[in-house]
Regions:
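Conserved ABC ATPase "signature" region
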Residues: 16-33
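Conserved ABC ATPase signature
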Residues: 38-42, 46
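Hydrophobic anchor residue at the start of the ABC signature
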Residues: 52
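Conserved catalytic motifs of ABC-family nucleotide-binding domains
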Residues: 59
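Catalytic Walker B motif of ABC-type/P-loop ATPase nucleotide-binding domains
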Residues: 63-66
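Helical segment within the ABC ATPase nucleotide-binding domain
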Residues: 78-90
């Protein structure tokens, strides 16, 4: 019912509403058996998924998501992030992800805007932003775990690039130093 609210307010046919509800529910991983449950019977993660599905069902050209992975387990978090990427690719929509999770931003963002004290402090591609890890930390923000690990390894004398922000990049850089050429073990 909650997922259908937006499409119904758009005065779509019942068939179109039903199609959009099922498509959006599938997108966020909500099984059909939850469709008729009361919101009081749902977990926090299920409620968050239903809220996201309600927006997706409207097929917006610009999708703004505020902390969409909050309250989700790691598997649910990864699923939502991948679905956001898939949605952007499939629809060509602009997706604005508001998050404090730099790991989430590192995984899916094409552009990152960092705000500090109500002003834009940084604006650029992930590699440009995360190469300024010390500034991010000084602002009280975390950096992706691979960035922290790479920084610690640089402090121990390893010659690693500044712009490491994903596990794949970290793995490839360490293997390249070891003569492995970036191939997986």
């Amino acid at each position: 019912r909650d997922i259908a609210f937006g499409p119904k307010s758009m005065k779509l046919s019942e068939a179109e509403v039903d199609e959009r509800v099922r498509e959006a529910a599938q997108f966020v991983g909500i099984p059909e058996e939850l469709f008729e449950k009361s919101p009081l019977e749902l977990s926090g993660g299920q409620k968050r998924r239903i809220a996201i599905a309600g927006v997706i069902a409207m097929r917006p050209g610009v999708l703004i998501l505020d902390e969409p992975t909050a309250g989700l387990d790691p598997s649910g978090c990864e699923g939502i992030l991948q679905n956001i990427v898939d949605y952007r690719r499939k629809t060509g929509s602009t997706v604005i992800l508001v998050t404090h999770s730099m790991d989430d931003a590192a995984r899916i963002a094409e552009r990152i805007i960092v705000f500090a004290d109500g002003r834009v402090a940084m604006d650029g591609a992930p590699e440009a932003v995360f190469s300024r890890a010390d500034e991010l930390l000084a602002m009280g923000l975390d950096v992706p775990a691979p960035t922290s690990i790479a920084k610690a390894l640089r402090q121990k004398g390893l010659s690693l690039p500044d712009a490491i922000y994903t596990l794949d990049q970290l793995r490839d850089a360490v293997l390249a130093l070891a003569g492995g050429g970036g191939e997986t073990c």
